Amino acid sequence: AGKTTTAGKLADYYRKRGLKPGLIAADTDRPAAYEQLEQLADQADVEFYGEPNAENPSKVVERGLKELDVDVVIVDSAGRNSLDEELKEELSEVNDVLEPDQSYLVMPADIGQSARDQAEAFDEATGITGVIVTKMDSSAKGGGALVACSTSGAQVKFIGTGEQLGDLEVYDPVNYVSDMLGQPDLESLLEKV
């Protein structure tokens, strides 16, 4: 889905707007996640906390919150297409420690039919407040994200439009629908009608 890259993009987004973000590597399932997030933090010039061989993500988050001196904390947690009970419990524990203001579900534009089940499970574990749709630069239209929003009651907040740190845009529903319909500028079209 591009979850770790999206965490780096969010950090870059907030830094460019005058805030001091920090990244916490709490994905203890994917071996390369720690290194990837550390590199992204370096590229975005933001604080980073992680423990390369950690096994308990909620403990990593707890220690990271004490170590980082930032305005915005962004946690890269584990994620999989199918959410098993173990991962739901893990995410719930991280959520309890973090007590986040925002909890984003990151989904690729091409997710399709599994979006509903994934959104329900993540919402149950963390209380989704927003959806970030990645890979909008592909041929996929992102309809699954709309299903996820309908299921969780959350709104799309951002869209990822490429692989670079700056390739994150605030969601604009008019542009989103225009892209889905293959219309480059729906607003102008509506004005003509």
What are these regions (language model features)?
Residues 1-192:
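P-loop/Walker A NTP-binding module and the surrounding RecA-like catalytic core of P-loop NTPases
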